[in-house]
Amino acid sequence: MAIKIGITGPVGSIKAEALQKIIGMLQNDGLNVQGVLISKVSDDGKLTGYTIEDILTKKKVQFCDEKFVSRVKIDKLGVDTRLLEEILIPSLQKARESADVIIIDEVGKLENTTKKIHSEIEETLKCGKPLIVTLHKRSRNPVLQEIKSLEGVRVFDITPINKNILPFKVMHVLKGEE
């Protein structure tokens, strides 16, 4: 049974910082880490969009922007679903084939953008590989509820107090030491 880890926390960069640290630790252990990372784009402190990056290929595109006209929105910003699918779908397919550990950053924001993305994320959540997902802490989030219901899942809530120790705790869980 593959270990599934959910990292929840407040809006802000502490989840991203912890995730980057975990990815670095996994790669230092010689593991093949694949999946996607989401980053905020801001202008003078105002959120203006999001980028998605394939961890393996380093290909990165801005898929969400205040200037994009779209029915699909994330945080009231327009989403270019074609750009999102171009990175996310092949990244998760490849990760299911060849990764040692799969990462899906901000899964809650992404999951309901298109049916293709929803099914790709569902398939990845159920695959037999170790998986780390991050999402905003919202108890009514259906993705969080789904992740919690998966067999072998551990959910950690990151806070400013535990943000430095959490990556080590996640590593212990992935190694079966906890």
Swiss-Prot record:
InterPro entries: Nuc-triphosphatase_THEP1, P-loop_NTPase
Protein name per UniProt: Nucleoside-triphosphatase THEP1
Protein family per UniProt: Belongs to the THEP1 NTPase family.
Keywords: ATP-binding, Hydrolase, Nucleotide-binding
Transmembrane segments: none
Enzyme Commission code(s) on record: 3.6.1.15
A Pfam family recorded for this sequence: NTPase_1
Reactions it catalyzes: a ribonucleoside 5'-triphosphate + H2O = a ribonucleoside 5'-diphosphate + phosphate + H(+)
Function according to Swiss-Prot or TrEMBL: Has nucleotide phosphatase activity towards ATP, GTP, CTP, TTP and UTP. May hydrolyze nucleoside diphosphates with lower efficiency.
Annotated binding of ATP, by residue: 9-16, 101-108
GO MF: ATP binding; ribonucleoside triphosphate phosphatase activity
Organism this protein belongs to: Thermoplasma volcanium (strain ATCC 51530 / DSM 4299 / JCM 9571 / NBRC 15438 / GSS1)
Disulfide cysteine pairs (residue numbers): none
Source taxon at top rank: Archaea
